[in-house]
C-alpha cells in the first residue's frame, strides 16, 4: 500500500469494516477517514455489500484507487455479526485486502455519554440505556473477537481519536506494525486495547518523596530516583529483552498495531518514566513508537473539549 492507503495499479482495493459499540466513535472515525481521502459508506445493508464491491470505481473517477471504509453495526438492516465475519473472510479468501476495525468503550462511559447528550440508544428505544448497551455488546461479540484492530475510546476525546486515526490511516501511516507505548494508572482502569502490559508498582514510588511528588516521570530527578531502585536495571533489561523478542514475531504474523501498556498506581511517575525509557530503547533498535501518557494530563472540562467521540453512531 502507498501513503494514505491509496492503491497501486493492480493491487486489491483496501476495504475496512468500521464497526463497534454505539457511542464509541464510529461516526467520528468515518468522518476522519473521509477527510484523509477514503471513500466512506455508513450504515450499508449487509445484503448490498457484494453489489457495492462489484461496482469498482470507473477509471479516472474520483474514487479510483481510494480505500473504502464501510460503517456496519447494529443499526444496519439485516445485521448479523457472524454473517459479517464470514463475508470478510470470504473477501480475504478471494484475494481482497479486507479488515475489521472495532471501536469499544466501557459501559459506564457509554452511559455517561448518552446521559450527557440526551441521545437515545438505537437498541433501547423503550428501555434503559444500560439495557441497550448490554444487548448490543452481546450482538457484537463475534465481530469484536474477529477484529483485526481494536480501539478503546473510553479515555479518548474527539481530538485524541482523530489524531490516533491520522497516525494509523493518514499520509504518515506506512507499512509494517504501528507501535504505541502507553503509560496508565491502575486506579483509572487498565487499557482494554493493550497487547502487552507491564506493572511498575514493584518500583519505589516518588509519590512518597515530598520534593518529587509534584513532578511527573518526565522530570529528570524523578527518573533518577526511580532508576536508583536496586531492582530497576535488571527488571528494565528483562522487560526490554522480552519486548524486542516479541515485536518481530508480531510483525511476521501480520499484526498491524501493537500497544504496550506500562502501568503504575497513579499514572504519573513510574509508568511515565518507564514508558519514555522503553520508547527511547525501541527507537535505538529501529522502531518508531508513539508515546501516549493516558492519565498524566486529564481533560480540564468536558465542556472545553468533548469526550464523546460519537454518541448515536
From Swiss-Prot:
PANTHER family: RNASE ADAPTER PROTEIN RAPZ. It comes from the Bacteria. Displays ATPase and GTPase activities. The keyword Cell cycle does not apply. Residues 289-313 are annotated as: Disordered. Residues 292-303 have a biased composition (Basic and acidic residues). GTP binds at residues 73-76. ATP binds at residues 20-27. Belongs to the RapZ-like family. Keywords: ATP-binding, GTP-binding, Nucleotide-binding. This is Nucleotide-binding protein Swit_0399. The keyword GTP-binding applies. InterPro entries: P-loop_NTPase, RapZ-like, RapZ-like_N, RapZ_C. Pfam families: PapZ_C, RapZ-like_N. GO terms for molecular function: ATP binding; GTP binding.
